[in-house]
Amino acid sequence: MAFVSLDELEAVEPVPGYVATFVHTKQMTLANWKITAGSSFPEHSHPNEQIMMVLEGEFELTVAGESELVRPGVVAVIPADAKHSGRAVTDCIAIDVFYPVREDYR
């Protein structure tokens, strides 16, 4: 699996307003998100490290009580077990990378 076309993957909506395609390797998960403006996800944590990058739009992300507007050119690094939440300020396209793999997204 050296190359994957995201257009050929089945899209799922694990949270209302968050439509994703996922690519899983043995060790990592990549999530390609299309997020509707105003959609939010509640504060939560997981044992996976996470890196988030917004390709289009603006996303308000809170990590361990610190909030930042994530937009193109800004990368968010979320440590394992850190509490975080977020809200799409505008329609967004974003990428998340998780290590280790997110088994709950398989």
Language-model region placement:
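A short, N-terminal "cap"/entry segment at the start of jelly-roll beta-barrel domains
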Residues: 1-27, 31
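Short strand-coil-strand connectors
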Residues: 26, 62-66, 89
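Conserved short histidine dyad/triad with adjacent acidic residue
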Residues: 31-45
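Glycine- and acidic-residue-biased ligand/ion/polar-headgroup-sensing regions
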Residues: 49, 53-59, 64
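A cytosolic small-molecule/anion-sensing beta-strand core signal
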Residues: 55-56, 71-72, 90
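Short acidic-glycine-tyrosine-enriched beta hairpin
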Residues: 66-80
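Ligand-binding loop in jelly-roll beta-barrel domains
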Residues: 80-104
